């Protein structure tokens, strides 16, 4: 294994930790959210839920895709959750990279990639017990997806200001992308409503202040 590829290393660790959950059965809310929900049983059902914000349509759409792959065989639902968790963890890696870039505290030359702060932060996020339910409990997929959109919005927000500061580019496309992910989050889980406040705080602490 190439230890200079922290993203690959992180992904493999997550697979090793959560790989034994792939055949865990449906539980609790999975019954009425998946097994008893007719909306996931075919692409023709998409128009019935895709316009309903209150039904978290993107989550249902992902279950619809699972049903197309394996119907009610549980393995594909768990594989999706693990893959989404890997994506979220890699986004944490990217976000902390951008924060450190603005703070100018770390550099690739000073710290090997495997031991960098971005990797440590992503590893803590990936393996922390608080993440367990969101990964192993299929109905908690809404939390993982909302986290992906949340982090993507933050990353593009940073990228937009990075373009302004270092490349003299207005960065409008990145700010539009951040807004787009905010909308996707709204179709996934209500926690996304805090994203504008997070953007304000990130701008205040990491962008508007000049590093010493």
Model-derived features: where do they sit?
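Polytopic membrane enzymes that build or remodel cell-surface glycoconjugates and lipids
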Residues: 1-212
């Amino acid at each position: 294994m190439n230890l200079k590829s922290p993203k690959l290393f992180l992904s493999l660790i997550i697979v090793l930790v959560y790989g034994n959950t792939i055949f865990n059965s449906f539980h609790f809310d999975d019954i009425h959210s998946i097994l008893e929900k007719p909306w996931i049983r075919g692409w023709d059902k998409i128009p019935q839920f895709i316009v309903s914000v209150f039904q978290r349509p993107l989550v249902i759409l992902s279950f619809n895709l699972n049903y197309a792959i394996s119907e009610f065989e549980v393995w594909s639902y768990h594989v999706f959750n693990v893959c989404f968790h890997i994506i979220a963890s890699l986004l944490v890696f990217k976000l902390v990279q951008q924060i450190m870039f603005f703070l100018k505290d770390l550099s690739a030359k000073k710290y090997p990639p495997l031991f960098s702060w971005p990797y440590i932060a992503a590893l803590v996020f990936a393996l922390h017990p608080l993440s367990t339910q969101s990964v192993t409990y299929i109905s908690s997929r809404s939390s993982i997806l909302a986290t992906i959109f949340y982090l993507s919005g933050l990353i593009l927000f940073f990228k937009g200001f990075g373009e302004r500061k270092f490349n003299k580019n207005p960065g409008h496309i990145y700010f539009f992308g951040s807004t787009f992910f905010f909308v996707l989050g709204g179709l996934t889980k209500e926690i996304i409503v805090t994203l504008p406040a997070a953007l304000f705080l990130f701008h205040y602490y990491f962008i508007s202040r000049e590093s010493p």
